[in-house]
């Protein structure tokens, strides 16, 4: 039995659908918290209230459903975490700790917990960032992701708990909008282009960040989950790379489809400083060698597919 926390979120909402298609709707519990689940998801299979900061609730859900695998998708993202340090600490650090403990106590067999490019910081080599390198993030979100990686590796080594994770870049998708991240501009730009032919970007035009299209993010999460345990040297800290671009490059690519699209810039100092502390591209040799990671989408194919799907969703 599988539990997905954060099932109403950007990644969780698509992951639940994919897992239910593969393993049967009745075998995948959609874990919800504040945001209600989409009606179709609620109707299609089991769901439960899961607030990871509430150990009792987490324990009850895992026991009641006999959960053996958890995909932990709920997290307070970078920009919101900077504005709500307490909540970020509660959810991203205490919540993750609860999950490790409760999983151990209930014989959960596998825990997938994504990390992020935020686990790097201003002292990390910025281009082609190695998998194993300096990790001194200067954001609370980044610190919580380093905590998650290190604790995950600790539980794996000390208790043989099968914890796995990848460092996700900005994820671009058309089904559910991301909230409160720094890379969200890349999704919002498509909404702006389709709705009003314009978008005001909060990052500078030349801010280069790693990005990935949702089908590749889902594939990475599922592929790491089914990778042969014995072939893994890393566990909770895999770089995965698909593409890197700047707001101005993305705008130009969107203009190829919609020539009326106009971009303007009004910089948000908070999100700009977060973006400036992150890598612009990643070396993902470890993921490619240890479990065969390979993305399918590059920037052009992402933009074409995203524009087409979002346009038909919005019109
Ligand atoms: C964010 O912008 O906070 C996230 C991330 C890169 O982890 N999308």
Each language-model region and where it sits:
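N-terminal Rossmann NAD(P)H-binding glycine-rich loop of SDR-like oxidoreductase domains
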Residues: 1-22
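NAD(P)H-binding glycine-rich loop region in Rossmannoid oxidoreductase-like domains
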Residues: 52-91
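Conserved Rossmann-fold NAD(P)-dependent oxidoreductase catalytic core, especially the SDR/UDP-sugar
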Residues: 97-140
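Flexible, glycine-rich beta-alpha linker
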Residues: 121, 136-139, 164-183
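Glycine/proline-rich active-site loop of Rossmann-fold NAD(P)-dependent oxidoreductases
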Residues: 146, 159, 173-187, 214-215, ...
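C-terminal substrate-binding subdomain of Rossmann-fold SDR/epimerase-dehydratase oxidoreductases
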Residues: 202-204, 210-315
């Amino acid at each position: 039995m599988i539990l997905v926390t954060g099932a109403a979120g950007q990644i969780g909402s698509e992951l639940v659908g994919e897992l239910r298609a593969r393993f049967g709707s009745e075998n995948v519990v959609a874990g919800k918290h504040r945001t209600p689940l989409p009606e179709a998801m609620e109707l299609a299979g089991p769901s439960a209230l899961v607030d990871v900061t509430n150990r009792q609730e987490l324990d009850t859900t895992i026991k009641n459903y006999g959960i053996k695998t958890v995909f932990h998708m709920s997290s307070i993202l970078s920009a919101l975490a900077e504005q709500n340090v307490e909540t970020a600490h509660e959810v991203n650090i205490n919540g993750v700790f609860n999950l490790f403990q409760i999983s151990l106590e209930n014989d959960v067999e596998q825990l997938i917990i994504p990390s992020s490019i935020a686990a790097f910081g201003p002292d990390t080599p910025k281009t082609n960032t190695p998998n194993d390198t300096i990790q001194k993030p200067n954001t609370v979100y980044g610190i919580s992701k380093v905590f998650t990686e290190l604790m995950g590796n600790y539980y794996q080594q000390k208790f043989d708990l099968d914890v796995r994770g990848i460092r996700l870049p900005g994820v671009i998708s058309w089904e559910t909008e991301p909230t409160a991240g720094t890379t969200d501009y890349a999704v919002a730009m498509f909404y702006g282009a389709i709705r009003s032919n314009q978008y005001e970007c909060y990052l500078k035009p030349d801010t280069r960040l790693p990005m990935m299209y949702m089908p590749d993010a889902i594939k990475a999460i599922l592929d790491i989950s089914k990778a042969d345990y014995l072939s893994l040297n890393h566990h909770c800290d895999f770089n995965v790379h698909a593409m890197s671009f700047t707001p101005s490059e993305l705008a130009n690519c969107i203009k190829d489809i919609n020539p009326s699209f106009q971009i303007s810039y009004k910089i948000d100092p908070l999100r700009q400083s977060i973006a400036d502390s992150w890598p612009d591209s990643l070396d993902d040799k470890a993921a490619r060698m240890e479990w065969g990671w390979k993305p399918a989408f590059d920037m052009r194919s992402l933009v074409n597919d995203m524009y087409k799907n979002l346009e038909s969703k919005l019109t």
